[in-house]
Amino acid sequence: ASINIPFSDSLASRTSVSLTSRDGFSQNVFNGQELDDADHTSFRTDWLLELSDTSSLRVFGQYFDADNNGAAIKGFYDTTPDRRKLSQNTLSKYQLESKIVGGIGEFDLGYATLKALASWQKDEIYVVRDNDRHNLFHDPSSVAATAPFYVGVEFNPESQIQETNTFEINMISNEPFNGVFDWIIGAFYMDQEIEGHIREFLDDNFNGVYDGTFADPYFDTSYSNMFPASMLPAGLSPGQIPGGAGDWGFMSDNYPTRESYSVYGQTTFNVSDALRIIAGARYTDDTVESYVNNFFGGQIGNLEKTSTKTTGRLAFEYDLGLNSMIYSSFTLGFKPGGSNLTYGYTEAEDASMGNAIAPPLVFPTFESESVTAYEVGIKSDFIDGRMRANVAAFFYQYDDLQFQATDPDVFRGGVANIPGSEMKGAEAEIIGILTDELTLDFKAAILDSEVTTDFETLDNVKANSTIPAP
């Protein structure tokens, strides 16, 4: 439901509320839980105040809440009849609460428009899920005979609280400087704080329960959420969770923060009615700090990574006529570095702990990614604007490309860097209105990519195939 209210000639608002509630259309046959259900509440209000003929202020807020059992993700070897039914030994849960408040102020200065944008957002998520996606111990008939051995694994819970503040101010020209230069200048700031917790349990001895208990400094996890009441072990006291005697896996408490600011500017030089030269630059300073406490003190790190970079773009556009344009561009791009939640032990640390010695492949921090991009193309409209064709060719050269990597040490993986790689290709797009009832949408692309430098990484498929059943 929505309502628009014009309070006066200068003040108006629009408010919307949406409620969704439905039973699940999938079922966990082991515990009877309905999955793919929905219990959502959404609220948004948007207010516009005309301060004067040349200035305005817009303020908006949004709230969203979800309290569901979670999605039905059926294991690959789950033989439960009916694609909407599965057998898993976890009572899953998905909860999300999101709040957003923002404002936009616009002020016409005559020669330019000044715009200020600010926002605050807070998201809280809480998830309980079955990580092995099967039920080999409690319902072996639901798992195919050809399946590999599955140890019971679940996250109970995985939670995160994320709070982000942003502010941006920019100025956009209303009329070309000296009659030929359009321009924009601005600055951006972001501050983000995250608190994350993960509790993973493993049925390592394959007896159907997570043996033992221990005190959790952060969670009073409800063991009754894990299994039907008939399977609950007795004697659990408040503040204790299962997982002693080796039946707990990845445990993490992490507190990353990010602070980023940048300044930027761009101008378009109108050389003639047909030719334009576009040039822009941006300077970014990005700092990540993270306190990581994994395995309740087994791996502790105070991590920090600062990335600074100046990027830019130079482009040429030439109108072949009223309906066609050719262009070329040279662009420098940048993705800041950061810190990892988990990372490998050094060879010295492996030796001191009596582990098999292997070089670390995932490090506490990772480097910034940068790209040098070249592109040429043509954009054309035909048949009185009823047909549009875009064709482009491109070449990208990456330094320190970021990718998701796995470390030889167990429970450790994160982002690593490929020192050098290249990507090139071409793409074409045709969109047309053939008749009042029929449209055409055609897209095609060819792509060739290559890693141009040597680096060490772990083949996950080969590594996993060497893990024996207990």
Task: Give the role of each language-model region.
Residues 1, 20, 38-42, 93-100, ...:
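Transmembrane beta-barrel architecture of outer-membrane proteins
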Residues 48-54, 172-174, 186-190, 254-396:
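Structural signature of Gram-negative outer-membrane beta-barrels, strongest in the C-terminal barrel
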Residues 1-22, 26, 30-69, 96-102, ...:
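Transmembrane beta-barrel wall of Gram-negative outer-membrane proteins
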Residues 97-124, 153-292, 319-321, 383, ...:
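Face-selective signature of the C-terminal outer-membrane beta-barrel domain
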Residues 172-174, 186, 273-277, 392-397, ...:
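Gram-negative outer-membrane beta-barrel transporters
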Residues 26-34, 71-89, 130-156, 199-251, ...:
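Solvent-exposed loop segments that connect transmembrane elements
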Residues 19-23, 63-67, 109, 120-124, ...:
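Transmembrane beta-strands of outer-membrane beta-barrel pores
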Residues 35-39, 51, 93-97, 159-163, ...:
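Short sequence motifs at beta-strands and strand-loop junctions characteristic
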